C-alpha cells in the first residue's frame, strides 16, 4: 500500500493551480494580485516532488475562482499548469492552461522604441509563436520575448 503524505489541508472551495514550474509560484501570486495584506487564505508549496516535472510548485487560493484573463497570464509563466476548481472539497472542474494565439494588453514589448511603449494610445499586442516554452513576438516591431516574461506583465 502506498502511503501518501498530506502537506497542506484540502480547501473547501476555490482554485488549486498545480504543475507550476518550480520557482514560479511567487510570480503566480503576483499575477493574481495576492500579497500578504489581501486577506485571502493562500497555500503555496514550492519545489514539491513530482513524477512528471521532477519538482513543481502548487498554489491554493480559497474562496476564489480565476477569471479567464488571470488564467491566460498564468499560462505565460507556467505553460504546463493545471487549474482545479474546488467546491465542497471536491474538484468540479479541471483543465490545463492554454494561451490564445494573440495576447492584447497583458505583456509589454521589451523594445523601448516600440510604438506600444511610446505615448501613443496603443495597447501592446503579442503573437504567441510557441506555447511550451512560451515564445512571444511583438505584433508591431517583431521583437521576440522568450525569457523573464513575468517582468513584462502589465
Swiss-Prot record:
Zinc recorded as keyword: yes
Transmembrane segments: none
Keywords of the record: Metal-binding, Pyrimidine biosynthesis, Zinc
Record-level GO BP terms: 'de novo' pyrimidine nucleobase biosynthetic process; pyrimidine nucleotide biosynthetic process
Entry GO CC: aspartate carbamoyltransferase complex
Gene Ontology MF, one: metal ion binding
Pfam families associated with the record: PyrI, PyrI_C
Comment on bound cofactor: Binds 1 zinc ion per subunit.
Names of the cofactor(s): Zn(2+)
Gene3D superfamilies: Aspartate carbamoyltransferase regulatory subunit, C-terminal domain, Aspartate carbamoyltransferase regulatory subunit, N-terminal domain
Chain residues that bind Zn(2+): 109, 114, 138, 141
Known function: Involved in allosteric regulation of aspartate carbamoyltransferase.
Subunit structure, as described in the record: Contains catalytic and regulatory chains.
Protein family: Belongs to the PyrI family.
The protein, known as: Aspartate carbamoyltransferase regulatory chain
Provenance organism: Methanothrix thermoacetophila (strain DSM 6194 / JCM 14653 / NBRC 101360 / PT) (Methanosaeta thermophila)
Name of the gene encoding the protein in the UniProt record: pyrI
